[in-house]
Amino acid sequence: MRRIKLVVSYDGTAYCGWQLQPNGVTIEEVLNKALSSLLKEDIQVIGASRTDSGVHAMGNVAVFDTESRIPGDKICFALNQRLPDDVRIQASEEVPLTFHPRKANCVKTYEDKILNRKIDMPLQRLYSYFCYFNLDLEKMQKAASYLIGEHDFKSFCAVRTQAEETVRTIYSLDITKVNDLITIRISGSGFLYNMVRIIAGTLVKIGMGVYPPEKMEEILEEKNRAAAGPTIPARGLTLVSLEYEKELAPYLEGENKHWHYVLDQRNVPEKGLAYLTIERCEPEELDGVLRRVIHQAYRNGAKRVFVRDTFGEEGSICGYYRLRRQPETEEGWLEAVYEGEHR
């Protein structure tokens, strides 16, 4: 058995998103059918990002398992002959069977385009959101700066999201304008359901002058979807790329006004041991930080995590932690369990 990775680009206009749907054609369905026809076996792809209806992609990633002996880097050429014109495989390669496109650490980059002029342009209508009101780019850029870093983005996700954890890290958020077209380019560790489109909708409101730029920080603190702006239409949104981590980062750091921690992963590859130092943390956020960061360490290969704090009573949370699976939950949620200070 071999695992093949695909880099997939598509015009999402005619599709009901990525994920299989009972009442509409999806990208996943098209790929499954084309691959099954090409390889003469039942193929089910696993996508990295399950984009919504109307969202486009330049570099989404998918994998599938096959018994075929066709060279991995040649599959893209054969597969493109069987795909519709609005779906193309940009590259294909064989990867380890352990590689999972949704579980591997990566940086996701999206672009959301806004056509900002008095009269709509028909040629842009499927690939941008039209805004009649003049938008103040400087105010939008200032507001965007509040979102950089690790934050709880609960205000910026759809109410019906299934995510139990709403903390994400934004590495960059750039807003540029060329002629009448504004591009919001955002890179992060991952995104909640509708998160990019809600951020874009909030930035539009700030650009219109409905909110001052400083309102963005207040919206973050609210942790309430009703506090943020509207979810703008999907047609202007494109998944640009997913850049996977080639080797484990020696350190992970998370910092905002509520917490600051450093996760040392240098001993994970050889000893399976990570060290988490919590420099400061508000008491009500501590359980969430512990659970989230220890879970990330285990995903990265750690078997145990040693925690120490420098902000509170010495020894209050210090010691070794492991993860315990909760069998009573369908998802098998992993809970951080204190083991004590023994080795």
Where are these predicted regions, by residue range?
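Proline- and acidic/polar-enriched loop/turn elements at helix boundaries
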Residues: 50, 92-94, 309, 327-330
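C-terminal "cap" of GNAT-fold acetyltransferases
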Residues: 328-343
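Acyl-donor binding region in acyl/amide transferases
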Residues: 271-322, 328
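Short, ordered beta-strand-loop transition motifs
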Residues: 104-106, 175-180, 266-271, 324-332
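A conserved beta-strand-loop-helix scaffold within acyl/acetyltransferase catalytic domains
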Residues: 257, 263-272, 278-279
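A short beta-strand motif that forms the metal-chelation/ATP-contact edge
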Residues: 170-174, 319-321, 336
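Structured-RNA-binding interfaces characteristic of tRNA pseudouridine synthases
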Residues: 1-262
